[in-house]
Design a protein with these regions (language model features):
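Bacterial N-terminal signal peptides
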Residues: 7-18
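Active-site neighborhoods of enzymes that stabilize oxyanions during catalysis
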Residues: 151, 165-170, 346-474, 523
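Metal-dependent active-site segment of extracytoplasmic phospho-/sulfohydrolases and closely related
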Residues: 288-330, 391, 468
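Acidic/histidine-rich catalytic neighborhood
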Residues: 307-309, 315-362
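Active-site nucleophile/metal-coordination loop of metallo-enzymes that catalyze phosphate/sulfate
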Residues: 29-35, 48-171, 178, 194, ...
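Polar, surface-exposed loop/tail segments
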Residues: 377-407, 474-511, 515
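Acidic, His- and aromatic-enriched active-site or binding-groove loops in soluble protein domains
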Residues: 93-105, 200-241, 275-291, 331-352
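Active-site His/acidic residue clusters
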Residues: 189-212, 239-288, 295, 325-328
Length: 524
């Protein structure tokens, strides 16, 4: 089948400390190679510093080898909030909650009705977790999502709202699928079918083995990740994820690793110092993940696919705190109790999760009084509050909650190290918040034709989505979030790089990689 590919063009022998728009590629005089597929990997929890430390200390690792022919973006930031759902959606839609309408894994929907209510009431918590599974203790989730647990939409005949239909904008998988390309994605439980996009058709081969079936230790989580890695290896062989049907290698596919995230938070894991030195369990987790990536690279090479595959490694979110001496568990009932003191029954939903608390009010006119109460010094101290976002301060970063019914009325940001969780919780770290340690994630874009470089200009993970489409020869502006938020591709990859992008000094003989005009080619 003839499909659109993209030729990546190399400028050899340039030492460029700074890239500007004037550094354009002469397509006719540069050697070229073709991107025919993109492998997208999220190592959940991976900070930029984690990647840097590992590559430096493991020069023969798969990640080191990929970085030796890749561009490392050292100042990449994931979504705010830095929860798994907005984090992943930023990568696959090119947009923030401003466009996606997905604030967090758990939120309040003022226009939907509770499960099983027959739409007799309106307003309900929506939570896209494994609580929606038929059985969250078995690998296949007991057959997937239980429709009886889904919120209902009274405006559409009281039908259940599946995760994909909650999303407001399309995804890279939908765009690629519509262009006739095969797509695949693998994640940790069935609610991640959201990545298929509003059509529900974006991912041809979706595999969501339930993470709740894995034992709660590093080895158990590694074994769980191994199931997903084998599915990727099957897809590289041109089969479906189960290895049963010959369907061809996807043009866009990938997975999310979980063991590193688990090893960061388990009481025996985490870091040994504030600089990010991994504990033995955390080191074991990243070494295992690296070995898995190595298996993928070897499989691509064995099939002659490696040279035409763009590999992107990033993270949906990071975790905080790195310095375990700063860790303090804050009882997650404190904040809703303070809010309800302002007015009885004022809390529609207080979703306290790790490094953030999001509050939806039954009476939105009370937001100012609630913020004032939470900002009192004694309450700030008891609840570990660093900042309360509401009104104009909230509207500067997201949609107005009066206009967008999915946005919380108040967002509480805790002090670095303070974690909202049930009293007595033993986790060492969490995510979801706005801090540097929550959001500063790894980002590596690798292809055999690249020379090793670092770009230190701040970038967002939203820029991955248009980058992927452009690399596949597709129009990034077909992504609705990209169009709405004017998201650009990552700098340094394409002809006409972003102005003013800073890069480290290249080694002698190193060059820049840039994308020329689309070219037609047969996909292997």
């Amino acid at each position: 089948m003839k499909t659109l590919g993209t030729t990546l063009l190399l400028l050899v022998g340039l030492c460029l400390p700074v890239i500007s728009q004037t550094n354009r590629v002469n397509a006719q005089s540069s050697p070229s190679f073709t991107v025919r597929r993109v492998l997208l990997l999220s190592i959940d929890g991976l900070h930029a510093v984690d990647l840097a430390i590992f590559v430096r200390s493991h020069p023969n690792s798969a990640l080191a080898q990929l970085s030796s022919s890749g561009i490392t973006y050292t100042e990449a930031s994931t979504s705010k909030p830095s929860n798994s759902f907005p984090g992943l959606l930023s990568i696959v839609t090119g947009g923030s909650p401003i466009s996606t309408g997905v604030w967090y894994e758990g939120a309040y929907a003022r226009s939907l009705s509770p499960p099983g209510s027959n739409c007799k009431t309106v307003g309900t918590e929506v939570i896209w977790s494994n609580s929606l599974d038929r059985d969250k203790k078995v690998l296949d989730a007991g057959g997937g999502i239980d429709p009886a647990k889904l919120p209902l939409d009274p405006s559409k005949g009281c039908v259940p709202v599946y995760p994909h239909s909650f999303l407001r904008v399309n995804t890279i998988f939908e765009v690629a699928h519509s262009a006739g390309m095969r797509t695949g994605w693998i994640d940790k439980h069935p609610s991640y079918e959201m990545v298929s996009g509003p059509s529900g058709m974006g991912v041809d081969d979706l595999f969501t083995p339930e993470i709740g079936s894995a034992t709660r230790d590093v080895k158990g989580q590694e074994a769980y990740d191994d199931v997903k890695v084998q599915a990727i290896l099957n897809e590289i062989e041109g089969q479906d994820h189960a290895g049963k049907v010959s369907v061809g290698v996807p043009a866009l596919f990938g997975m999310a690793f979980q063991v590193f995230r688990f090893a960061q938070v388990t009481p025996t894991g985490g870091y040994t110092d504030a600089s990010g030195t991994p504990s033995a369990p955390l080191l074991d987790a990243i070494e295992h993940t690296d070995q898995s990536i190595g298996k993928m690279v070897r499989a691509l090479k064995a099939r002659g696919l490696f040279d035409s595959t763009l590999i992107i490694i990033t993270a949906k979110h990071a975790q905080a705190p790195i310095d375990r001496s700063k860790r303090r568990i804050i009882d997650d009932t404190i904040i809703p109790n303070l809010v309800n003191r302002v007015k009885g029954g004022l809390v529609a939903l207080s979703y306290a999760d790790g490094n953030i608390t999001s509050i939806w009010l039954t009476d939105q006119s009370q937001a100012g009084k609630v913020a004032e109460t939470l900002s009192q010094p004694s309450n700030q101290s008891a609840a570990g509050i660093q900042k309360v976002l509401w009104g104009e301060s909230l509207k500067l970063m997201t949609n107005d909650p009066i206009q967008d019914i999915r946005v919380p009325d108040i967002v509480v940001i805790p002090n670095l190290g303070d974690i909202y969780a049930p009293a007595g919780d033993t986790i060492l770290a969490a995510h979801g918040g706005f801090s540097e340690e929550d959001t500063h994630v790894a980002l590596l874009v690798s292809s055999p034709g690249f020379s090793q470089r670092m770009i230190k200009t701040p970038v967002q993970t939203t820029q991955i989505a248009p980058t992927i489409l452009k690399a596949l020869g597709l129009n990034p502006r077909t992504l609705q979030a990209v169009e709405k938020e004017n998201t650009t591709s990552l700098p340094g990859l394409f002809e006409g790089a972003e102005p003013g992008a800073k890069t480290s000094q290249a080694a002698p003989g190193a060059g820049t990689a840039s994308l020329g005009a689309d070219s037609r080619s047969s996909r292997r």
